[in-house]
Amino acid sequence: MPIALVTCIELPRPDPDLPILRESFARRGVSAEVVVWNDPTIDWSRFDAVVVRSTWDYVANLGAFARWIDEVERVTRLVNSAPILRWNLHKRYLLDLSSSGVDIIPTTLVPAGGTVDWAALFARHGDLVLKPAISAGSFATVRVGRGEEAAAVEHVRSHGGRDFLVQPLLRSVVEHGETNIVCFGGRPSHAIHKGARWSGQAEQSRGLVAPTAAELDLAARTLAAVEGLGLGVPAYARVDCAAGPDGRPLLMELELLEPALFLDRLPSAADALVAAVLADHASE
């Protein structure tokens, strides 16, 4: 049976990972088809596994996407698993990981329609970053300068109905960017250095880097925490981190849903994801 590599009908940018993954599956003698998640003509039961890749329009179709996860879970195997996908949809997962001992960027969750003491947050952190708790890419992610309380309130209000995360603007992100560590089957594969990205901006990746021992330790502890929450080991993960004020890496995001994996920077890395997908099937 073939493998489905799931994307969306209108990509905001090409997904270079898809042809590389197809070629890697083909070398294993496995057919991999690129399909659109909300194509009503697709019979998902004919696939041995459905691997979520560039479903980057799910934010605008959240209810339908959640129902799609339920539908596919009933008839075949999702990669990552349905419980992992559901958990990773909302960035409150950061608070779950913090409770499990993972060092995250300080994060305040503002529920839709809720209030927050903006003056206290500005006093504690200085400049802030506001981002929707359910988002893809840099959608509605902005930085707000110290004292710009009115701008913060208006930004959240203008996206009414959405939960928001409020985080400090790390100087290291502005000056040096962040490290994205790609992991397959719970093991680090490769890492890239990426610049800060705000709403409306293109991604600014700067090529492969060697993650530090501290960054690798953070990635390992993060994935161990996911397993400790009863979610199992993700077939693919991207651990996004940056240096905190004391130099220690902090988790910015854990991408388990539809992360870019930057396989165009290291095409051979696709074999590790293919192996994880096929090994997961063999263990069933």
Spans of features found by a protein language model:
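Rossmann-like NAD(P)H-binding beta-loop-alpha module
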Residues: G101-L128
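Conserved anion/nucleotide-ligand pocket segment
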Residues: R124-A152
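ATP-dependent carboxylate activation and anion-phosphoryl transfer catalytic cores
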Residues: A213-E284
